[in-house]
């Protein structure tokens, strides 16, 4: 099997977090305790343990699991936001991640300003975003709200804007974390139609959902996470 057909390879991924046994309200309090020589005791928490899978170009992987199962953590490892404690992730292509609703946005900026801010996070040039701006605005259906600070947006409006920016060009790998679980049903269907076009063009998708029916409709593979 040649690498040209592989989009993503996840090998023995585990990630450990340290949770404080004591209540520490903020970073300042933590530093003071350390300066005073007070020991902070931690519990180890494994968010993911020994995750393995491989995706071919064009695969659509649905990731299912209850809250706290490690779905979002897995996507953050794949996107490079978190470094795994053990294991490796091999990516073959440009990734467009939509991991947290509004991540990469500045709430005090308008929707228009955030097009350029979030677009730059995704690696798009300002010139490219100016060229694609009307297309982004049209798909988002935000209209005059594009000039309103996004701290005044509903979660559905932020999802519209984020999805419209992230999918303005087809990436090789698209990561979606429950983005299609917010907003109105009409816009979700519109997003699904755009995703279907990407599927037809061979884009690889990792898609977190609580809906088994949605995963069955959109994905050709699925994994179920239970406590990592």
Indicate residue ranges for each PLM-predicted region.
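Pre-NBD coupling/linker segments of ABC/ABC-like ATPases
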Residues: 2-49
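The feature captures the beta-strand-to-loop junction immediately N-terminal to the Walker
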Residues: 64-66
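Conserved catalytic segment of ABC-fold P-loop ATPases
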Residues: 217-224
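Conserved H-loop
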Residues: 211-217
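Conserved ABC ATPase "signature" region
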Residues: 28-36, 116, 128-145
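Conserved ABC ATPase "signature" C-loop
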Residues: 227-228
